Amino acid sequence: MSFTVIIPARLASTRLPNKPLADLGGKPMIVRVAERAMESGASRVIVATDHADIFAACAQNNVAVQMTRTDHPSGTDRIAEVAAVLGLSDDAVIVNVQGDEPLIDPSLIAATATLISREVPMATAAHTIDDIADAFNPNVVKVVLDKQGRALYFSRATIPWHRDGFAQSREQLPTAYAPLRHIGLYAYRNSFLQAYPQLAVSPLEQIEALEQLRVLWHGVPIAVHVTPHAPAAGVDTPEDLLRVRRYFTQ
């Protein structure tokens, strides 16, 4: 399947200033992310940014980059603008890779892209939770699926709630209980991506602070690729940055 990867990147970060430009083994983080995406088999990889410094860093490292407006409320709106500028067809598949994932598995990008079909215009990924602390951590977003592997709901709460298992103990995951952790990787059919910014914000999205709930609330199916392996963690804190720097200097 042919697909395009678009990587939204903003310079502002409350916990880690100038994160996209952080040096990782001699290259900016955003360049490292793009290089991983290039290994996915994507027909095109392009960075979407509203900052001249990120644009310059990409250009200096031969990474395709497109300037965008500065007023986008989300990364999804930003990649929708770039897809429109590129003149991609309605049926084109676009994958949104986060700009702070320099260790993302290229095969995960490709597997998520392949789930897009005429019936399912959006896809994402998940993996099995094996740590009870993650099951109860509201910063770990959970997802439950239907029999077709499509998302029924995303939540910061522990879903599904194993009534009998948790009645016995909340110190360990119940037997035969496999909660899924959502991975923030998204693929779209371009026709839906262009319509997305016009979708009204949903009450559930506001309650949970999860943008993907807007899609489900409007009745649009989301396919979910379940990977057997937990993905490498992204870079959100100075500690994360040190960990990833060690990887690139080995």
Curated annotation (Swiss-Prot):
Gene3D superfamilies: Spore Coat Polysaccharide Biosynthesis Protein SpsA, Chain A
Annotated localization: Cytoplasm
Gene Ontology terms: biological process: CMP-keto-3-deoxy-D-manno-octulosonic acid biosynthetic process; lipopolysaccharide biosynthetic process
Swiss-Prot/TrEMBL keywords: Cytoplasm, Lipopolysaccharide biosynthesis, Nucleotidyltransferase, Transferase
A single cellular component GO annotation: cytosol
Reaction catalysed by this enzyme: 3-deoxy-alpha-D-manno-oct-2-ulosonate + CTP = CMP-3-deoxy-beta-D-manno-octulosonate + diphosphate
EC number(s) stated in the UniProt entry for this protein: 2.7.7.38
GO molecular function, one term: 3-deoxy-manno-octulosonate cytidylyltransferase activity
InterPro entries on file: Cytidylyl_trans, KdsB, Nucleotide-diphossugar_trans
Tagged with keyword Cytoplasm: yes
Pathway: Nucleotide-sugar biosynthesis; CMP-3-deoxy-D-manno-octulosonate biosynthesis; CMP-3-deoxy-D-manno-octulosonate from 3-deoxy-D-manno-octulosonate and CTP: step 1/1; Bacterial outer membrane biogenesis; lipopolysaccharide biosynthesis
Superkingdom of origin: Bacteria
Chief location: cytoplasm
Entry function: Activates KDO (a required 8-carbon sugar) for incorporation into bacterial lipopolysaccharide in Gram-negative bacteria.
Similarity comment text for this entry: Belongs to the KdsB family.
Alphabetical list of NCBIfam families matching this protein: kdsB, PRK05450.1-5, PRK13368.1
Protein name: 3-deoxy-manno-octulosonate cytidylyltransferase
